[in-house]
Amino acid sequence: MKYGFIKVATAIPEVRIADTKFNLDAIEKQIIAAEGQGVEIIVFPEFCITGYTCQDLFRQQLLLDDSEHAMMMLLDFTRQLDIIAIVGIPVCVGPLLLNCAAVVQHGKIIGIVPKTYLPNYAEFYEKRWFASARDLCPTQIHYAGQTVLVTPARQIFRTADGVKFGIEICEDIWAPIPPSNALTLAGVEIMFNLSASTEQIGKHHYLESLLAQQSARTLSAYVYSSCGFGESSQDVVFGGNAFIYENGSQIAKAERFSLDPQLVTSEIDIEKLRTERRSNTTFVNAQKDMYVDPIGGVLPEKTYINCLPRQNAEREFTLTRKINPQPFIQSSHMEAACEEVFNIQVMGLAKRLVHTHCKKVVIGVSGGLDSTLALLVCVRAFDKLKLDRNGILAVTMPGFGTSKRTYTNAVALMKELGVDTKEISIVPSVVQHLKDIGHDTVTHDSTFENAQARERTQILMDLANEYNGMVLGTGDLSELALGWCTYNGDHMSMYAVNASVPKTLVRHLVTYVSGMTKNEKVAEALRDIVDTPISPELTPADEEGKIQQKTEDFVGPYELNDFFLYYFLRHGFQPSKIYFLANQAFAGKYEAGEIKKWLYNFVGRFFRNQFKRSCLPDGPKVGTVSLSPRGDWRMPSDADCTNWLAEIEQL
C-alpha cells in the first residue's frame, strides 16, 4: 500500500458450464494479469469455478469433486503469488451444500465465507440446492487438502498492511439488512461481492444505485463482480457487471454485454475512507449498536483472519485512476450543481434580509469575479423576495490600479441589472490618509495596498449606515485559505455570500449565469469578466491601462491552490500525498518543482492567516469544505506549520 492506496481488481472470466478445468484456466490467466499490474486483491463472480447456472448438476458428486480438485490446482498455482484471490465455489459441510467464497493466497485457503441470503423467487431457486450460512454451525472441514473453519460468524480479513475487507455473495447486498452493514461497522473498509446477477430492463441502473448507496452509507469501498457471457442463456442473460465504488462514487466499471473476459482494476484510497469515518460521528455512534440485531437478537461473533505477508519484492506503485484536477467542480452535472450552489447563496442572503427587516444592501463592485457573483446573488435574492432592485446600492470605487476593462464591465453590469449605483473614487482620500501617516504615497508596499482596501470597506460601511442597509461581502473561500484579503478591509462585511465558494467554482458560476440570462449585454459583460485576469488592482495599471498586478503571480494558480485546499481540508491528507496527487492530476501542465513551490506557499499562508478566519462574518456553506470558525474549521491562530513545511522540503 502506497500513499494510502490499495490496488484491487474485479474480474469477469470466460466460463463454461460445469467445465471446471476450462474455468480454472480462465481464472488463472486473469490472476496472472492482475498480479502483473500490482493488484493486491482480486474478486471473481459467484461460482466462477463451476459456472452459476449448473442447476441440478450441483447435486452431482462428480461436479463437486471436480470443483474441489480445481481448488487444489488453484492453491498450487498461487503458491508463489502475493495476490489475494476471492473465488466462488460450492462447499459441502456435513449434510449442507453451501454457496461460498474462498479467499486464497500463497497456496492456502485463508477463509471460506458462506452465502447468507439465498434468493428463491422469480428466476432464482437457490434453496433447491443450497443451505444458508444461518443453517450452519461453526465446523472445521477438510477441503482441497487443507483444514478450514467454515462459520456463520462475520469474517473480517486483514491484509499485511492492515486493510480490512469482508465478503458478500450476490443476494446478500439486496437484503434489507445486508451483512455488509455489520461488517463495515466492525471495521471492514472494502466489501467484495461475488455475484450472478441476471439482466432485466431497468435493473442495471437500480444495481448501480444500490451499490453506490451501500458504499456511501457504510463509508466503504465496494468491489463487485458478476458473471457474464458463457453462463447459460436458457431463460435469462448474464450481462457481466463489474464495478468499483469508493464512498458512493463509481471509480471503475466493466463494459456491459461484452463477449470477452474483462479485468477492471483501480486503486482504493483507504486513507480517505478512514478519514471520513473518523470525521463522521454518526458512523462512530452506529458502531456502538452493532452487537444487537433488532430482529434476531445478538448478532454472530466476528472472526478476524490475517492474510499472509508479502513474499516477493514490492512492485513500483502506479496510480491508474483519474484524479480530477478541479475537485470542487462536478463536470458530469455542472449546470445542476451551479444552480444548486447559486440557490444556496440566494436563500442564505434572503433569510438574513428577512430576519433583519433590511431592504437595502450595499455592495462594492470592481468588475472582478467575486464581486460579480455576489451582485448576481443579491439580484436573485431581491427578485425572490419581490423587493425592488433599487434597494441594491452597487458602488464602484476606482483606485490607483483600476483598469479600463474592469471599470467598464462593472459599470455596464450595474446598469443592465437595474440596481442603484454610485461611483466614488478612493484616490483623494487614500492619498490624504497616506500623507497623514507619513507615507510617501509612491512606494507600492503593503501599506499602500491595504489602505485602499480599508478605505473601500469604510465607504461601504458608512453608506450602509447612511441608507440603513447591510454590507454584502464578496471574498471567496480560496482567498480566505490563502489569507489573500486585507484584515478589516475586504475581509469584513455584514454577510459574506461567497465565503465557502472556491475561486475555481466562482468562475463556473458566473459562466453559468451568463448562459442563463436573457439580457445579452449582461451576458457579454459576464463573459468578459470571466476572461479577465484575477487581480486586486491595488497597484497602478500599465501605460495602456491594462492590469499589471496579477494575483496568481503572487499566490500561485488558483486551480492548484483549490486542489491543495480540497485535499488538505476535506480529507486531511499530508503534504506528500497531496503533492503526489497533484502531480497525477496536473501531469503535463505543471512541473513537479512548480507544484512543490506553490504547495509550500499554500501551507505557509494557510497557517499564518488563520487569525483572519477566526473572525469571519456569517455566510452560507455551499459544499463539503468550509472555513467558518463556527462550523467546519476550528484552528488556533498561533498553530505552528514547521512539520508540514519540513515534509514538503523533503519531497
Question: Can you annotate each of these PLM segments?
Answer:
Residues 1-362, 380-389, 416:
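Enzyme catalytic cores with a strong preference for nitrogen-chemistry domains
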